[in-house]
């Protein structure tokens, strides 16, 4: 047993050494731009016509077509997506690829870049307190609850942030500014929909996608505190989808087989577990690398018309390299749903505030 544990940790150490550390610098905005970004980011930076608002309110969140994205939602704001990459440097570009993939499908680039230095992704080595704090900042500024996409150890951090927001591991949390990349001296926000004060603890994320969280990365010291709670999803998220792969040594419990990879709700959160097609050793890191799909029309057609499944498999008739397409399609379906839900929620609240004034 000791030999097996030592061998596993040695393999992980070698992988981290060869792959490089996945920590990236979160560069704050230049001093001269801080005030401008502070004053312009969020609700004050956009307006929609009454006609477009009516079309958005008429959308069915469960069936958002490519035409809806390209026309009805074009130019509309979107919930910020916080992407958290794993612990190896090579996965950074793959999460950036996934960010570009969503942009190419029609999701606003501004909603995937942090306003400080323009980062598309943050490291799993950042504190979960920071992640929870920027969730609060984005919600207060934008009026839409953010989404989180976590890959590998990024999935651990996503769940840690949920535990913090649920009050399971903290009584108070600071708001964090992604413009300055530092905490603010407050633990409350003004709820943009009600105008009332609300502590950071108790806020919700709209959607989380957690890909390849578990496996041998559980033995890393920075994840020991999640050994027995990784699969427990608290009420601080509306919808949570866990993705796992067969033969995934790095991110799959029992090599990605069976219910040990399944997340479960501790309360009212909607939780799905999706088994992706079995791959090889490299599939764990390569799955999010999907911007190549943007130049494959048959693949895009399948992605845009995807019907959710707990074991999705793309048709073999689609040409080209398809690794990861099922992950991309399922996430895009959920992202579209929560984009519409959050935007409709914001529009209705603004109408209510006008009528109540």
What is each residue range found by the language model?
Residues 17-37:
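Bacterial Sec signal peptide processing site at the extreme N-terminus
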Residues 109, 127-253:
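Serine-dependent carboxylesterase/thioesterase catalytic core
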Residues 32-146, 316-321, 325-355:
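Active-site catalytic motif of lipid deacylating hydrolases and related acyltransferases
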Residues 7-17:
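Bacterial N-terminal signal peptides
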Residues 95-99, 158, 254:
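Short, highly selective alpha-helical patches that border small-molecule cofactor pockets
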Residues 220-357:
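C-terminal catalytic-base region of ester-bond hydrolases, centering on the histidine
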């Amino acid at each position: 047993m000791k030999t097996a544990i030592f061998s596993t940790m040695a393999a992980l150490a070698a992988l981290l050494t060869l792959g490089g550390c996945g920590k990236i610098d979160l560069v704050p905005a230049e001093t001269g731009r801080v005030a401008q970004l502070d004053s312009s980011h969020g609700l004050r930076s956009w307006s929609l016509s009454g006609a477009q608002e009516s079309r958005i309110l008429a959308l069915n969140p469960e069936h958002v077509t490519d035409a809806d994205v390209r026309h009805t939602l074009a130019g509309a704001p979107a919930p910020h997506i916080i992407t958290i990459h794993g612990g190896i440097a090579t996965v950074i570009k793959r999460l950036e690829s996934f960010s570009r993939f969503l942009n190419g499908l029609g999701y606003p680039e501004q909603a995937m870049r942090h306003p400080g230095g323009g980062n598309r992704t943050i490291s799993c080595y950042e504190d979960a307190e920071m992640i929870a704090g920027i969730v609060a900042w984005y919600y207060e500024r934008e009026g839409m609850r953010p989404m989180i996409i976590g890959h590998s150890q990024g999935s651990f951090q996503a769940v840690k942030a949920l535990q913090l927001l649920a009050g399971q591991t903290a009584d108070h949390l600071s708001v964090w500014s992604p413009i300055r990349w530092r905490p603010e001296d407050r633990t409350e926000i003004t709820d943009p929909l009600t105008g009332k004060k609300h502590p950071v603890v108790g806020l919700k994320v709209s959607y989380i996608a957690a890909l390849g969280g578990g496996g041998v990365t559980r033995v890393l010291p920075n994840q020991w505190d999640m050994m027995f709670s990784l699969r427990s999803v608290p009420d601080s998220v509306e919808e949570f989808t866990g993705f796992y792969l067969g033969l995934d040594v790095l991110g799959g419990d029992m090599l990605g087989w069976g219910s040990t990879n399944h997340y479960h709700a501790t309360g009212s959160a909607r939780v799905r577990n999706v088994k992706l097609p079995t791959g090889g050793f490299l599939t764990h890191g390569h799955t999010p690398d999907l911007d190549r799909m943007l130049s494959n029309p048959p693949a895009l057609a399948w992605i845009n018309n995807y019907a959710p499944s707990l074991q999705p498999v793309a048709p073999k008739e689609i040409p080209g390299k398809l690794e990861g397409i099922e992950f991309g399609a399922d996430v895009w379906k959920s992202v579209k749903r929560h984009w519409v839900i959050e935007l409709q929620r914001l529009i209705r609240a603004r109408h209510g505030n006008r009528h109540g004034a």
